[in-house]
From Swiss-Prot:
An accessory protein needed during the final step in the assembly of 30S ribosomal subunit, possibly for assembly of the head region. Essential for efficient processing of 16S rRNA. May be needed both before and after RbfA during the maturation of 16S rRNA. It has affinity for free ribosomal 30S subunits but not for 70S ribosomes. The keyword rRNA processing applies. Binds ribosomal protein uS19. One of its GO terms (cellular component) is cytoplasm. This is Ribosome maturation factor RimM. Belongs to the RimM family. It comes from the Bacteria. One of its GO terms (biological process) is ribosomal small subunit biogenesis. The PRC barrel domain binds ribosomal protein uS19. It is found in: Cytoplasm. HAMAP family: Ribosome_mat_RimM (MF_00014). One of its GO terms (molecular function) is ribosome binding.
């Protein structure tokens, strides 16, 4: 199966004719109109953004085949995905979150720490979540200082843990 990337989430209905609020996760919010049909997380449904206009922090979008408020309301919370190969190539030092998930994580000495489980953003910057083979996950700032090496082709990231993590000794990840 081709890797897919979540590019948008449908929000509440807007108006009476089936428009929806659409939160995009792309650099250019309007790019979701150019990807063609987008699929739901389970792949069971295809939805195409036929028209969109900018609102304060989201888009107001018309989805092909969605013509009533009731239909739009049923889509609230639906995540929309596109095949990874439809996305533009990234510049040096830029990554799609989907490309990082599953990479092996090592410390600077080469000791395995686990795998990249997720990338989060709770409003103060990106957080990289590392899942070790055993024990709780580790969440660290996704900065150049903490993650100095991202080698997608080599399937790994290097983590240089901050001096203290929850009161533990420096670099004792």
């Amino acid at each position: 199966m081709t890797a897919r990337v979540c590019v948008a989430r449908i929000g509440a209905a807007h108006g009476l004719r089936g428009e929806v609020r659409l939160w995009t996760f792309t650099e250019d919010p309007m790019s979701v109109t150019r990807y063609g049909p987008l699929s739901t997380k389970d792949g069971a449904r295809q939805l195409e953004v036929s028209h969109a206009r900018a609102a304060s922090d989201h888009l107001i979008a018309t989805l092909t085949g969605v013509t009533t408020r009731e239909e739009a309301e049923r889509l609230n919370g639906t995540e929309l995905y596109v095949a990874r190969d439809k996305l533009p190539e990234t510049d040096e030092g830029e990554f799609y979150h989907a490309d990082l998930i599953g990479l092996a994580a090592f410390d600077a000495a080469g000791t395995a720490l686990g795998t990249v489980a997720a990338i989060h953003n709770f409003g103060a910057g990106d957080i990289i979540e590392i899942a070790p083979a055993r024990g709780p996950t580790l969440m660290l700032p996704f900065t150049d200082a903490v993650v100095p090496i991202v080698d997608i082709a080599g399937g790994r990231v290097v983590i240089e843990a901050p001096a203290e993590i929850d009161g533990e000794e420096p670099n004792s990840v």
